Amino acid sequence: DHRDLHTAYRRQRQMCIRDRYRASYAGVKIRLNVRGVCCLQPDLKKISKNIKVTSIVDRYLEHSRIFSFYNNGKPKVYISSADLMERSFDRRVELAIEVKDADSKNKIQEILKISLKDNIQSYILESDGTYIRSKPSKGSKKIRAQSYFHRSAVKNAGKIATISEDAFTPHKPKTKNFGTAV
C-alpha cells in the first residue's frame, strides 16, 4: 500500500533528523551543505545548537554527495549516490562507499571544505526555516566554491590531456565470432 510506504519514509526521515539532533545535543558539531529542501531545524538551543546548514545556489546544478565523519579524531570519508530524499529511501537502490585512498580522501575533503567556506553564493538556514545569504566578513577572503572548482578544472585539464592515449584503448577479445549472432 502506498500509504504504508509514505509512513515508512516519514519515519525514516524523522529518524535521520532525530539522530542528528541527538548528536548535536551530545556536542557533535555538524555541518550540512544541502542543495534542496531541508526539514532539519538548525541552531535551536539544547537541540540543534551545533548544527549549521548551508545551501549553495550558483551557476552549476552541482551537488556532491560527500559524507565526512571523525571517529576518534580520524576522518572517515564516504561518497554516495544517495541523498536523503524520499526517492532514495523508497524507489531506488543507492550506495555509499568509504574512500580509503589517501589522495582521493584529501581531494574530497578539500571539495567539502571549500563548499562549506563559500561566502558569496551560499545561504544559511535559520532555525525558523528562512535562508540568509552569506556575506564575507570585513577583511576576509571572498570564496565562491563553484568558481574555485571551475578554475581548478580548467587548470588541471591540460595535465589530463597529456595522459597516454593508449591508456584508454578498449581491447577486443581474440574470438572470431565476437559480436555476431550464432
Stretch-by-stretch model annotation:
Residues 33-70:
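HKD-type phospholipase D/PLD-like phosphodiesterase module
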Residues 55-134:
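HKD (HxKxxxxD) catalytic microenvironment of the phospholipase D
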Residues 27:
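Phosphate-centric recognition/catalysis
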Residues 11-14, 41-42, 49, 103-182:
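Flexible, glycine-rich loop/tail regions that form catalytic "lids" or insertion modules at the edges
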Residues 18, 41-42, 87-89:
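Short helix/loop capping segments that flank catalytic or ligand/cofactor-binding pockets
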Residues 30:
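Hydrophobic anchor at the start of a short beta-strand
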Residues 1-13, 17:
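Single conserved hydrophobic/aromatic residue that forms the stacking wall/gate
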